[in-house]
Curated annotation (Swiss-Prot):
Family affiliation: Belongs to the endoribonuclease YbeY family.
Gene name, Swiss-Prot/TrEMBL: ybeY
Broad class of enzyme this protein falls into: hydrolase
InterPro entries according to UniProt: MetalPrtase_cat_dom_sf_prd, YbeY, YbeY_CS
Keyword presence, Ribosomal protein: no
Cofactor note: Binds 1 zinc ion.
Protein name as catalogued: Endoribonuclease YbeY
Primary role: Single strand-specific metallo-endoribonuclease involved in late-stage 70S ribosome quality control and in maturation of the 3' terminus of the 16S rRNA.
Natural source organism: Borrelia duttonii (strain Ly)
Length: 148
């Protein structure tokens, strides 16, 4: 049975904005009408995410965000979540500089990205103008973005 459970922790990194981040995630879940969830979010370094990326996706390199859905095989958008999101803060430091955005915004964008994958959205490219998932991601970010 799914309930409302949200767990956050860090692996190999320090993070000081847990309360604000927790409330941000709750606002995203609410905005997306997700009422039932068991979600863990791990903020980590490149070494940690690279190990997982190599093990589960056969890509032995760091990445920004990974999502692990416990409802594998679902082909439709589901408004229940049971899964994990892993985000490399170290990776986001570089991408925030590359895209000229604040670190907290890049963290929020990648958190939304992970949540959208968990409810069934996918994308074939990183085209923010034409990919439905990425268009939704940016809309959710505009509506829920917070400074912390």
């Amino acid at each position: 049975m799914i309930k409302e459970e949200l767990n956050l922790w860090a692996e190999g990194v320090e993070f000081r904005h847990w309360d604000a981040y927790y409330n941000f995630i709750l606002s995203v879940l609410n905005f997306l009408c997700i009422k039932e969830y068991e979600l863990s979010v791990i903020l980590c370094n490149n070494e940690y995410i690279q190990k997982l990326n190599g093990e589960f996706r056969q890509k032995p390199e760091p990445t920004d965000v990974l999502s692990f859905n416990y409802f594998e095989g679902s082909e439709q958008i589901n408004h229940k979540i049971q899964g994990d999101i892993i985000i490399s803060l170290e990776y986001l430091e570089f991408s925030s500089l590359e895209f000229n955005v604040e670190m907290y915004e890049e963290l929020q964008r990648n958190t939304i990205h992970g949540i959208l994958h968990l409810i069934g959205y996918t994308h074939d490219t990183n085209d923010f103008q034409n990919e439905t998932m990425l268009i939704i991601q940016e809309r959710v970010l505009r509506e829920t973005r917070r400074v912390f």
